[in-house]
């Protein structure tokens, strides 16, 4: 029997693709609405939206995650469960040959044609195993930030797909929490150099010290304490964020607070495990991986005001999460790259969230809430000090009215930060400072943007007028910032033409300030 088979399909035809998959499923006849097939149905819908025209079936795949599940559980069955899987690779070019190797070679010469793969387990209840597919095509409405590039080898040819791994729980070796943890660990493995456990290993790590119900089969899922233990064992720093009291009704205030709390991690590309408890339903875990963009939000989320010298007209600060709608999730129960609405009856929503656990690295001692609060305080103190210099200097300069601002906080690798600065339209002297300044491996960045035009951020047409950098391995209460950059829009002189950088030496704490070009530049677009 040939290990490879080639199929041509009509782009956008979901029914045709579903019909192709049916013979590969252990239980034949995938029926719409059947919970066990809902993830696969939504996956088919996503593949169709990517414009798939060719499918390469690869048989007898030794999928490492299913092999681990098989060893731990399925090999113990009296009924013989196969050890190997089927894998389907998708391309947006039409196959022009019946010879699989010729098709593979042609597609390898057109690398952009590769859309990713879906692995099918040889079990009836939960057939969809390791899946990596490109995100949705509409980049201006879908910002999938927790992702990586994955290398795929097929018959000697190498392919690459950028996406977020997805897996359906098998409801035996692992439930929803294990599936979400697997997705996050697999996404972060190359970037962070940490372990990428199989679902069986995740269950073992999670139940090492605390056991509730049966460990195998683990149909009852995991509690928060078990989830955090699995993360700690995998080399991450568990950090539980409370979002809503269990039993408390979701309100506009709790949903807004949840969006504010989660957004900095999502914008940082950090996967976040969110625990949902819908009304009159069992708890469920999903993985937060990105967000959409609403150019015209119904209201703006306030970050507070900055009052300078007891002014009656404070500087208004709004939060960048105001424009974030919806969040995007991987939901092992329903499928990949799906929206998480704010509040919707009969569907998982942000209002159902009671807590969240970001996959923070071990060297991050300052969380997002602390970083944002600290940077806002540093901004207020800096503007107050600069205002006093102008007021007490006797220069006769008019103190101007400050613009309304939007702040956005995220964690960023220093190499990524420097690359973004280098490619930006920031003034050269400010660029040179950031390129040569010592920075830790990762930094908290709080962007300072003008509210005017901020809705155009995805197009790079908004105006960034400064940023504050914070060392995540420091003590914010002791003033351990790295630098504060304020453009001319933030200086109190009515005719200010230059900006200022306040630089702090990370080793001895020495602080110096110097003038730099004061032009505006665009916020980061990931």
PLM segments and residue spans:
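Second-shell loop/turn segments in exported
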Residues: 162-171, 215-217
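Active-site-adjacent substructure of cysteine-protease-like catalytic cores
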Residues: 232-314, 322, 450-451
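Extended, H/D-rich, highly charged conserved domains that either
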Residues: 172, 177-180
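Active-site-adjacent bridging/hinge elements
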Residues: 144-161
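Noncatalytic regulatory segments and standalone regulatory/sensor domains
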Residues: 1-149, 291-526
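Active-site catalytic microenvironments for nucleophilic, acid-base chemistry
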Residues: 183, 187, 291-294
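Catalytic-core signature of thiol
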Residues: 2-21, 156-158, 178, 188-249, ...
